[in-house]
Amino acid sequence: MKVIVVKNQLEGGKIGLDLLKKSMANGAKTLGLATGSTPVEFYNQIVNSDLDFTDMVSVNLDEYVGLDGSNDQSYRYFMTKHLFGEKPFKENFLPNGKAADLEAEAKHYDQIIEENPIDWQILGIGQNGHIGFNEPGTPAEITTHVVDLQESTIKANARFFESEADVPRKAISMGLASIMKSKNIVLMAYGKEKAEAIKGMVEGEVTTELPASILQNHANVTVIADEAAVSLLSK
């Protein structure tokens, strides 16, 4: 696991863009994408670049249950706003949070990932160590699944909604086993509130209680983080 320390999200976004360019030059065709505040500057860098994605496929990590793509808090809306609206792809896949049969939708999404193996996956990390919506206690072998969001995640995401009561309680998320199949993983983290999770992920034992720690078992992980996020690392 390689750790790159940056001054801020702007520098992190630029480094992320450079890593993506190298991966695309080496033939990457499928990108795994994340949402939330962490990758926004990275997406800004992509939008302002000359990269062409018209022959590329994207596969997103997750989506809230109950929100359709027109809802401004859905992850499809987020991706359209920050990336897809400016940089067209050959195809964009996200879980359908409005599916009548959520378990069937999870199986369908696994099939999409099987048909579009992820070459380059971007991740954020939650304060509790979640990646995607894989909360503490999630089995390592799980693929796409329906998740009951933990209270800490609901509280962390409440700032995006009118009130905490409006935050969806469930999501469909790519599983840890799905994420681990990605050829290359780049995880971004900014701010002191991520320091405990980063320490556990990089230096702690691999445990389901800190889902991101499973990344220690992946051969190609790069962490892009600011000084605050790496402040608890011993090396």
Swiss-Prot record:
<feature type="active site" description="Proton acceptor; for ring-opening step">
    <location>
        <position position="130"/>
    </location>
</feature>
<dbReference type="GO" id="GO:0005975">
    <property type="term" value="P:carbohydrate metabolic process"/>
</dbReference>
<feature type="active site" description="For ring-opening step">
    <location>
        <position position="135"/>
    </location>
</feature>
<dbReference type="GO" id="GO:0006043">
    <property type="term" value="P:glucosamine catabolic process"/>
</dbReference>
<dbReference type="GO" id="GO:0005737">
    <property type="term" value="C:cytoplasm"/>
</dbReference>
<dbReference type="Pfam" id="PF01182">
    <property type="entry name" value="Glucosamine_iso"/>
</dbReference>
<comment type="pathway">
    <text>Amino-sugar metabolism; N-acetylneuraminate degradation; D-fructose 6-phosphate from N-acetylneuraminate: step 5/5.</text>
</comment>
<dbReference type="InterPro" id="IPR037171">
    <property type="entry name" value="NagB/RpiA_transferase-like"/>
</dbReference>
<keyword id="KW-0378">Hydrolase</keyword>
<dbReference type="GO" id="GO:0019262">
    <property type="term" value="P:N-acetylneuraminate catabolic process"/>
</dbReference>
<dbReference type="GO" id="GO:0004342">
    <property type="term" value="F:glucosamine-6-phosphate deaminase activity"/>
</dbReference>
<feature type="active site" description="Proton acceptor; for enolization step">
    <location>
        <position position="62"/>
    </location>
</feature>
<comment type="similarity">
    <text>Belongs to the glucosamine/galactosamine-6-phosphate isomerase family. NagB subfamily.</text>
</comment>
<feature type="active site" description="For ring-opening step">
    <location>
        <position position="128"/>
    </location>
</feature>
<dbReference type="InterPro" id="IPR006148">
    <property type="entry name" value="Glc/Gal-6P_isomerase"/>
</dbReference>
<dbReference type="InterPro" id="IPR004547">
    <property type="entry name" value="Glucosamine6P_isomerase"/>
</dbReference>
<dbReference type="GO" id="GO:0006046">
    <property type="term" value="P:N-acetylglucosamine catabolic process"/>
</dbReference>
<dbReference type="InterPro" id="IPR018321">
    <property type="entry name" value="Glucosamine6P_isomerase_CS"/>
</dbReference>
<dbReference type="GO" id="GO:0042802">
    <property type="term" value="F:identical protein binding"/>
</dbReference>
<keyword id="KW-0119">Carbohydrate metabolism</keyword>
<protein>
    <recommendedName>
        <fullName>Glucosamine-6-phosphate deaminase</fullName>
        <ecNumber>3.5.99.6</ecNumber>
    </recommendedName>
</protein>
<comment type="function">
    <text>Catalyzes the reversible isomerization-deamination of glucosamine 6-phosphate (GlcN6P) to form fructose 6-phosphate (Fru6P) and ammonium ion.</text>
</comment>
